[in-house]
Amino acid sequence: MSLENIINEAFENRAQISPGTVGAEVREAVAEALRLLDSGAARVAEKKDGGWVVNQWLKKAVLLSFRINDNRVMDGGETRYFDKVEPKFGGFGPEEFRAAGVRVVPPAAVRRGAYIAPGVILMPSYVNIGAYVDSGTMVDTWATVGSCAQIGKNVHLSGGVGIGGVLEPLQAGPTIIEDNCFIGARSEIVEGVIVEEGSVISMGVYIGQSTKIYNRMTGEISYGRVPAGSVVVSGNLPARDGSHSLYCAVIIKQVDEKTRGKVGINELLRD
């Protein structure tokens, strides 16, 4: 039976699985799935033919790992932890860090089962299990990357940014930030929203699946996806009767890679 089939079958019977009852085949299959995620050999979501495809069986493996493992004491350098998932860098020495090609500034924390590509800089931040952070990305101070979130190449997650995680409900897609995006300080992108390549999100913008995304150039309102090259700020849309207004995200312009390369981020956000 394939690794995927073992995971799928075990997940269907998860109510009967515990640390004391799990079989060796399932335990090893879950461990192998987490090794694949940890090394970047597999990822929860990948782009194919221009669209994002979610590998649900890998999400199932992450969820099963919580059922089959007890909490245990873990060393974490300056402190100790009591959890089901080991710290990714817990056993790293100088050679392992050089081979990984990442910078990890204390007290940044990454759980095993997350992939951190070469060239990534982790300021004091948090990356959860199943996440994928691609090369050249900066995860700035107090930013959090949730479970199974997918972060592209050369992305800047500014201070305090929250990228939402998603394990359940199982059918929910992960939050995705594509290549060359800038996410401004204290912004939150959650609930499987996709921010497409080259977009700039201003400081303090909150986008979930129910958030209206208003394109002021076309007057269109959309949900769940920020188109490529968008420059987005927070705003409000008035109610039909004029009695109140409700929060929305506003696309104020769209720029191509050439323009973005010539103009600074702050200049793009000025109107």
Swiss-Prot record:
Primary location recorded for the protein, binned into one broad class? cytoplasm
UniProt EC number:
2.3.1.117
Annotated localization = Cytoplasm
BP-aspect Gene Ontology terms: diaminopimelate biosynthetic process; lysine biosynthetic process via diaminopimelate
Catalytically driven reaction(s): (S)-2,3,4,5-tetrahydrodipicolinate + succinyl-CoA + H2O = (S)-2-succinylamino-6-oxoheptanedioate + CoA
Give the CDD domains listed for this entry. Answer: LbH_THP_succinylT (cd03350)
Q: Which family does it belong to?
A: Belongs to the transferase hexapeptide repeat family.
HAMAP family of this UniProt entry?
A: DapD
**Which PANTHER family does this entry report, sorted A to Z?**
2,3,4,5-TETRAHYDROPYRIDINE-2,6-DICARBOXYLATE N-SUCCINYLTRANSFERASE, MOLYBDENUM COFACTOR GUANYLYLTRANSFERASE
Put simply, this protein is called 2,3,4,5-tetrahydropyridine-2,6-dicarboxylate N-succinyltransferase
Recorded source organism is: Methylococcus capsulatus (strain ATCC 33009 / NCIMB 11132 / Bath)
Name of the gene encoding the protein in the UniProt record? dapD
